[in-house]
């Protein structure tokens, strides 16, 4: 059994995605129905939708679109991590609207697509602190060189539950293990961060990676955060750049071979159930 904490739906007929023009491998529709067929075969029973960096004017429309899909009979979707702009004045009112929607489980603002100092702005930090006590999480999608800024932001908002996406986005293709490793160790010292074991197949060489390629990265994340502070995600359809959903699930099983069942269950579903109150 898996809870997928990181699913993206791309429906270009419904929503604008400006960044797709620079990502030709993903510049097509990736619809819920396609995902769900494969996900069920892989043992995924529940999924969280992760915002897909739509045009900012369409942030609420994305949430509404995904919520409509979730209402269909038998849907795997149990909630959404929605887009936000904490650097803008309208965030406080936006936060109140999202708090009133039980389908919304948290927020994400991708920070590796904006200048590094965006997360250091006074308004940004004030707004992140506002999330504290709401029961909503904040996903951190950052690059290894931003680890110091991540740690500083987390320290300023101790009441916020943060989720570090994609094992901190290691450059596995270039074998850049050491600089990434130090950053993970530093971030993991903050008890209000959990790490998402997701995305890594897209950062490895698509032609040559194996479970053994990924293992040192996954093992360092688990050693740093501990079994109680890790969750699993598919990062579909981005995982298709490195083999696809079924391949990533198989690699996960291979890397967890011999791991105690109680620990496996924490990573694969129990921690997510606790974190987002499914």
Feature roles, as predicted:
Residues 6, 47, 66, 80, ...:
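Conserved, mostly hydrophobic/aromatic
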Residues 1-3, 26-46, 220, 225-231, ...:
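Mid-to-C-terminal alpha-helical segments outside catalytic/metal-binding sites
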Residues 10-13, 54-57, 87-90, 112-115, ...:
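Active-site environment of divalent metal-dependent phosphoester hydrolases
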Residues 1-67, 250:
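An N-terminally biased module of ancient metal coordination in phosphate/nucleic-acid-related enzymes
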Residues 1-10, 40, 112, 122-123, ...:
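A generic "structured core" feature
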Residues 60-146, 152-154, 196-200, 207-208:
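Active-site gating/metal-coordination segments in enzymes
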Residues 118-231:
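Catalytic pocket-lining loop regions of alpha/beta-barrel enzymes
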Residues 57-76, 160-164, 214-223, 245-255:
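Short, electropositive alpha-helical surface patch
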